[in-house]
């Protein structure tokens, strides 16, 4: 059974990776080390998570121990929206690279399609609390990122949270040198993303699913929000296969040839979440999970929903 997805660059991206959003400094280092020991090779990072330095320490320690080689790892990071101008993009990238203590990234993504005003704040607002946008677009950012590939600092480029119209704009960009190899999006039984996944795959773009467990620890959860980890149908499927609910939620993506990056800092969960290659969900199981879709999102920069390039107004 294959454990990776092949990108258009011929690189192999492991189907299960470790997410690091919300992993607190002080815990993320041990989590990454435990994950390497458990067999993870794909690590999903981002400038805006403010914990890349510890992730880098963990990777370096494991390389020194000869537990893993750099070339066997698949390290991903993301450019935040306040750095879309080329000079700022270079600075942000250099900080990511030095924090991660690497000399190249396997994949560099545009984290979110809307540009935000440059400055110290990740979410800049005026005195009225309105989010300040940037004149620079994701197309400007892409040009700078392409130079990183040409310099050998990044192996491949991708996007995150893009709808298919935005991907289309990028693919049709005059003078495009490097096509996106991935689109990383929220995906779980309440947001199955069937049309977007179909579109991406038709364009040779791999999909990475974030928040596959419904992001239960997101800081802005409302009490009335649905809880993906408590869906009765998933519990039933898990019991039938003698697997955990999380394992079924992760396996659901693997069987769609979608990479998946569950986040955990709990040792037992880290081990469990990658043990998804020894069972198969039936066609009935898959159909039942897909039927749960309600286009419900746990994540998104909803404060910018009135601005240009907000990605989630479109059907897909």
UniProtKB/Swiss-Prot annotation:
Enzyme Commission no: 1.1.1.21
Leader sequence segment: none
Keywords: Cytoplasm, NADP, Oxidoreductase
Name assigned to this protein: Aldo-keto reductase family 1 member B7
Active site per the UniProt annotation: 49 (proton donor)
Subunit-level organization: Monomer.
UniProt note: pH dependence: Optimum pH is 6.5-7.
Keyword ATP-binding: no
Family membership: Belongs to the aldo/keto reductase family.
Catalysed reactions listed for this entry: an alditol + NADP(+) = an aldose + NADPH + H(+); prostaglandin F2alpha + NADP(+) = prostaglandin H2 + NADPH + H(+)
Chief location category: cytoplasm
Known regulation of activity: Inhibited by tolrestat and epalrestat.
A family per Pfam: Aldo_ket_red
Domain of life: Eukaryota
UniProt keyword Ribosomal protein present: no
GO molecular function: aldo-keto reductase (NADPH) activity; aldose reductase (NADPH) activity; prostaglandin H2 endoperoxidase reductase activity
Binding site for NADP(+): 20-21, 44, 160-161, 184, 210-215, 263-269, 273
Entry GO terms, CC: cytosol; mitochondrion
Positions marked as site (Lowers pKa of active site Tyr): 78
Lineage: Eukaryota, Metazoa, Chordata, Craniata, Vertebrata
Function: Reduces a broad range of aliphatic and aromatic aldehydes to the corresponding alcohols. Reduces prostaglandins. May play a role in the metabolism of xenobiotic aromatic aldehydes.
